[in-house]
């Protein structure tokens, strides 16, 4: 799984970097030719895209390194750090967009050749949609937080390019303040996306538990297994592609140690079949010593 994960995540990061570089060149020409503040906003966003995607590429490669003596749980948390860094990059570009929009709202500037801007923005929109579609497929396959953060970033670019098309169309008919108004709206939306991305990254760094549905699947696997009377103290988290799962099994007092170990091994393999690549730790407890208080999961 780790090989497939690494290959897909690396390709997604490289694709994003190449696409952002191509779009930057196109937008530099479009801004120089039209003077549109919305296209300037998109140009600045492409600069941020390149910085964020390059950061993503470097961090993803680092996060894929195997565990070592100093990082016994691996380097997966680097993905969360990349997502947090991206949220900061994006917040900065959103602030620049907002301030530029206010300036041009107060002093609107007529646009040169909005038709050229429309063509360029259409090209950027199509390219970004293709990239987001690929990233969404990679996220579905890998659940990579770094790629998901990048995807959210480029999804906001799709919204931005759509808004720019409308603004350029209105400017073509003489409503020059539309350009600035849409720049303000885009800035607000991008800031919202950045804050949401930063929140998710911080939650991962704080070792938030796996989603409720995944934890319930683990409980269902454990409590339905022959020889297991119940379970307690389920603890989960995720670091990069790896899920970390710890749980205590409750077994009959007179069950031989070898048999208890065999049951625990079978449960572990069942969990790994459902969540490949996980790090699973199972502890066996005799029913008579199981504390009555705390979070317990009994057979139904």
UniProtKB/Swiss-Prot annotation:
Spans through the membrane: 12-32, 39-59, 82-102, 114-134, 164-184
Pfam families: Cation_efflux (PF01545), ZT_dimer (PF16916)
GO cellular component: a single term: plasma membrane
A GO molecular function held by the record: cadmium ion transmembrane transporter activity
Keywords tagged on the record: Cell inner membrane, Cell membrane, Ion transport, Iron, Iron transport, Membrane, Metal-binding, Transmembrane, Transmembrane helix, Transport, Zinc, Zinc transport
Superkingdom, natural source: Bacteria
Catalytic activity: Zn(2+)(in) + H(+)(out) = Zn(2+)(out) + H(+)(in); Cd(2+)(in) + H(+)(out) = Cd(2+)(out) + H(+)(in); Fe(2+)(in) + H(+)(out) = Fe(2+)(out) + H(+)(in)
Compartments (UniProt record): Cell inner membrane
Disulfide bond residue pairs: none
Subunit and partners: Homodimer.
HAMAP family recorded: Cation_efflux_FieF
Family: Belongs to the cation diffusion facilitator (CDF) transporter (TC 2.A.4) family. FieF subfamily.
Name this protein carries in UniProt: Cation-efflux pump FieF
Species of origin: Citrobacter koseri (strain ATCC BAA-895 / CDC 4225-83 / SGSC4696)
